[in-house]
Amino acid sequence: MPKKAGKKAGGKLAGLTEEERLLYMQQKAQAEEEIAKRKEDMLTHFLKDKLQKEEKNTVLNLHKLRQQWRAVLTQTKIAELRNDMSVLSQTFERVLDYKDNIIRSLQVDLSERELQSELKRSSHLHNVDCLLEIHKSRLAQLEFNFKSSLVELSSEYNTEREQILSQHQQECVDLDNVMFSMEKHYSDLDGEAKRDYQSTRNQIKKRNFDDKQAVKEQMDGVVEKLWQDQQQVLNHYNESTRDKIITTDDLMNKDVQSAKEIDSLKKHIQKLQDSISTFRGQLSSGQTDKTAEQLRSERDELAQEVQHFRVQLNAAQAIRKKHITKLTVQSNDATKKLQEIVARGERLLRQCEMCCKLETEHEKVLPFYKSSLSEEEQKQEKAKAMESSNEKLTQLMHDYSPLAKFWQRYNKVELDCLCVKREKLLLLQENERLRLFLKQYLDEVSVSDESFRQQKLLVVSSPALQDTAATDRHQQKRHVVQEAACIVQKQL
């Protein structure tokens, strides 16, 4: 049967023309493709159903397995927990017995210590009673000694009181004379100091105004120089970035041209697609395969050219964006640096004005200190500093050599500050010494009038009073007392 069918088919094809044979072959191929597609769809549907059944069975088996596994684990865990409970109960009983024994021993110790505490308290009370008796006897003896010493001191105090009264009256007269002379002397000194201060103040005002004008002119020149440097930097920046700007403009023009070319290519591709659709219609109506292959090759070439142009366009856009970003960052950095330079110049101007205001007359006359080195030694030091193996370091030292005067002046100010601090410390020590002298003088000499009017004065005695206190006071060494007026005159 198949051979006959083949013969019939061969006979049937033999009676057809070339175009009919091609059409027949195409229809046959389409029928075979449809049959194969139907078989593939049926197989896919069958496999999907089988997969769903397998998934359902897998879920059910997993559920059963988990149930069995949970039961096994529960039994195992129950046995372990029972063993742990027995062990813990035994441990708890053992710990409870141990703590009961400790509590019993602590109760015994507490009773013994309470007994010892009671014994110690009774002995302590006995000792306190003994000490009270001893203290009372000692107080009685001290009271007797105090009364006897008080009688002696009162008689001695009355004699000294009369002597001090007479001496105080004489010293009051002397102090009044000294105070009058000192007030007159200080009033003359105050007037003279005010006149000197006014004249010095006028001179300093005039000198400060002249110095301020000079510094202002100097700082105007510095600001002008900074502005010129800023303009030079800006011009240099514009010259250095001019080529990059031109390159950026060229890239932008190329970008525009590339966009135009892409648009034209898109239109050309659209035309080619239209022609391809027409060729496909012609092909379906019976044209040759050769024309279709040529059209496909032309389409692939055009697609490659379009892709190549797109890559070039993206690369050009990335390069242009990178150049623009770099130029923006450089311009921002240059602007910030110029603003910092201007702010630094303004800050220097303000600091110079403040320094000129705070400058003393001595600093204006002698702004620099004299070096302890000779001229030859200074030249040798400078030559050694300049003789360096590093050329950059040598150039930097040469560039910053004008700052030597500034550092000399700064070091002079630091030395002056140290000298002023040392002088302040010495003056504070001298002030403390004078205060001590004045306090001693007032303690030994000055007595207020109210104290002399009182009938009884408080007497401070040593802790242990003896019968020989009066004789020891007479034998004490008398210190030489110097008046405060004499000390002040010597210091002035």
Curated annotation (Swiss-Prot):
Family label: Belongs to the DRC2 family.
Coiled coil: 16-95, 256-318, 373-401
Biological role: Component of the nexin-dynein regulatory complex (N-DRC), a key regulator of ciliary/flagellar motility which maintains the alignment and integrity of the distal axoneme and regulates microtubule sliding in motile axonemes. Plays a critical role in the assembly of N-DRC and also stabilizes the assembly of multiple inner dynein arms and radial spokes. Coassembles with DRC1 to form a central scaffold needed for assembly of the N-DRC and its attachment to the outer doublet microtubules.
Compartments it resides in: Cytoplasm, Cytoskeleton, Flagellum basal body; Cell projection, Cilium, Flagellum; Cytoplasm, Cytoskeleton, Flagellum axoneme
Organism phylogeny: Eukaryota, Metazoa, Chordata, Craniata, Vertebrata
Protein's UniProt keywords contain Cell membrane: no
Keyword set, alphabetical order: Cell projection, Cilium, Coiled coil, Cytoplasm, Cytoskeleton, Flagellum
Self-association and partners: Component of the nexin-dynein regulatory complex (N-DRC).
Swiss-Prot/TrEMBL GO biological process terms: axonemal dynein complex assembly; cilium-dependent cell motility; regulation of cilium movement
Protein name from the UniProt record: Dynein regulatory complex subunit 2
The keyword Transcription regulation is assigned to this record: no
UniProt GO cellular component terms: axonemal dynein complex; axoneme; motile cilium
Species of the source: Danio rerio
A Pfam family hit: NYD-SP28
